[in-house]
Swiss-Prot record:
CDD domains: RPS2. Keywords: Ribonucleoprotein, Ribosomal protein. NCBIfam families: rpsB_bact. This is Small ribosomal subunit protein uS2. Signal peptide: none annotated.
């Protein structure tokens, strides 16, 4: 099992939190101190929590379960899409649509429409339409693909969520909580860890940090799937209760 180490996290700037005036007291136990009015995250605490989350994801993937990667803010979207695609996992990189989990039946209908438009764009149907109608369908296709392209092959609800910036993706976390879907989340010093089953205290803004989180998670999914291919039986633990978060 491959583990993240302290050197990796320091190089990526995982330890740099937000300005001290924006801190969330519920993250106090993960803060080492402050430097130039910036909170410094205690990586001695982050390291085992990060590796525990990776172990959970690897075990889930070994059971052929689906992990949905969520990161819709500007600094995260591109990396989320690339790493999710690398490990063959579903993702949301543009905008979380309300009801994406709790109203998946309706979302499924939109995915069906997306697939229909994809077929029409490839089989020459668009070319037979009026210019205006073809343009409207092309715009519909682009809009649906931007919103749902990352989950069109998910097939059903995911078995876990991995979230970059839990405050930014609070709606996604709330929906997962309602459905009992475990949440793994990067939680910065200005955010609340509530509703997150596997907390990774760390910088949720720096590109290199996001690359480390996403790359490590994608690697964990790939390792888990390779375990299946190799016939390895792996026991999947239940996520610790979100209610256990102190504060």
């Amino acid at each position: 099992m491959s583990q993240v180490n302290m050197r990796d996290m320091l190089k990526a700037g995982v330890h740099f939190g937000h300005q001290t005036r924006y801190w969330n007291p519920k993250m106090g136990k993960y803060i080492f101190g402050a430097r130039n009015k910036i909170h410094i995250i205690n990586l001695e605490k982050t390291l085992p929590m990060f590796n525990e989350a990776l172990t959970f994801v690897e075990r889930l993937a070994s059971g052929k379960n689906k992990i949905l990667f969520v990161g819709t803010k500007r600094s995260a979207g591109k990396i989320v899409a690339e790493e999710a695609a690398r490990c063959g996992s579903p993702y949301v990189d543009h905008r979380w649509l309300g009801g994406m989990l709790t109203n998946f039946k309706t979302i499924r209908q939109s995915i069906k429409r997306l697939r229909e438009l994809e077929v029409q764009s490839e089989d020459g149907t668009f070319a037979k339409l009026t210019k205006k109608e073809a343009l409207m369908r092309t715009r519909d296709l682009e809009k649906l693909d931007r919103s749902l392209g990352g989950i069109k092959d998910m097939g059903g609800l995911p078995d876990a969520l991995f979230v970059i910036d839990v405050d930014h993706e609070r709606i996604a976390i709330t929906e997962a909580n309602k459905l009992g879907i475990p949440v793994i989340g990067v939680v910065d010093t200005n955010s609340s860890p509530e509703g997150v089953d596997y907390i990774i205290p760390g910088n949720d803004d720096a590109i290199r940090a996001i690359q480390l989180y996403m790359g490590s998670m994608a690697d964990a999914v790939i390792r888990g799937r390779n375990n299946v291919a190799g016939g390895t039986d792996v026991f999947v633990e239940e996520a610790p209760a979100a209610a256990a978060v102190e504060g």
